[in-house]
Amino acid sequence: FRSELIELLLNAAIQAPTAMHEEPCAFVIIQDTQILKTLSEDIKKNIRKQMVSGNSSSEHIVQLVEDDDFNVFYNASTLILICSQFSNKFTSADCWLATENLLLTASASQLGGCVIGLSIDTVNTKKWKDILNIPTGAEVISSVILGIPKETPPASPRKQVKILSWKSLALN
């Protein structure tokens, strides 16, 4: 993708509301296919280690990481990591709001986007923070791949809205 398109997405991301107007988000953009491939392999290796140590994963994830040909990033050309530059009670929520803005803008720009949650543990290791120049104290909160979709899949069915409580003041 052209840098102008990435800048459009990032500018949309930073328009998201933040608690106390702290604006904690910072971004890492990866468009190097070799780095993406190596990172994908490390993620699969780390998930396999977790499985051996007793941390169970869903059967679907187990099948994916056991497949040598599976690329965690689905061979997308661009990965954007949304990071918090510092930590407080609301920074994670702030970064997720930025992630949603980024994804909505990507969709409006005819791009496909997908959150890759499997990557978070690995990109937050010292090894990958060093490779990606993520400073000490910063934390990757979300990970989004972007690409040009071959097709637009139908919307997934959603569960009905579940309202736990609704209290209102009845005006007479």
Set out the residue ranges of the language-model regions:
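N-terminal amphipathic, basic helical "cap/leader" segment at the start of enzyme domains
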Residues: F1-F73, L171-N172
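Short, surface-exposed beta-edge/turn micro-motifs
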Residues: P24-C25, A76-L79, V140-I141
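A glycine-rich helix N-cap at a beta->alpha junction
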Residues: I47-S53, E59, I131-S156
